[in-house]
Amino acid sequence: GHAGKVTWAIEQGAVGGVPLTGFAFGCASNADAFMPSPSQFTYFQGGGFDVSFLSFLEVDRQGNVNVSKLGKKPYLTAGCGGFVDITANARKIVFAGLFEAAATLVLSADGLKVEKPGKFSKMVDEVEHVTFSGRRARETGQDVLYVTERCVMRITDDGLVATEINDSARFVALRV
């Protein structure tokens, strides 16, 4: 594993330790230090880190990402938060999330399987709101990956290209 080789930095100020999820999102267990949030953002804005790991609401064929607006349920998002600061100067970005919202996955000896398809695809023709620009990422030379349970995609001059496909995950239709 990579334990001891990774130091997590969270926008709320925690450095090191293990990031917490759910209601405790933004906190960390056994953090090495706590920075004032403005200092943490100065660090992020300066690109002082190797890789950013973030999630997404929607991704489109050009690599644009929406994390800040979900028209049908605007109460589910609180805006972009520190997302723009974290992605603007990152040399490498890994977006990770489910290919379909609310899909049920099962991990077995045979691999990862989609037990129940999601309610809707998070891979869309055009995102509702551009919080991260795929075009800007290409222009600035950022290395961007999109990781889902079904495939890994990389941003290219032609848009998203699947570079790895999970053979055990049942595909409905990959229209990216």
Task: Set out the residue ranges of the language-model regions.
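Active-site pocket-lining segments that scaffold enzyme catalytic pockets across diverse folds
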Residues: 1
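Beta-sheet entry/capping signal
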Residues: 5-7, 50-51
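Short internal beta-strands
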Residues: 6-14, 96-97
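Conserved phosphate- and dinucleotide-binding cores of soluble alpha/beta proteins
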Residues: 16-176
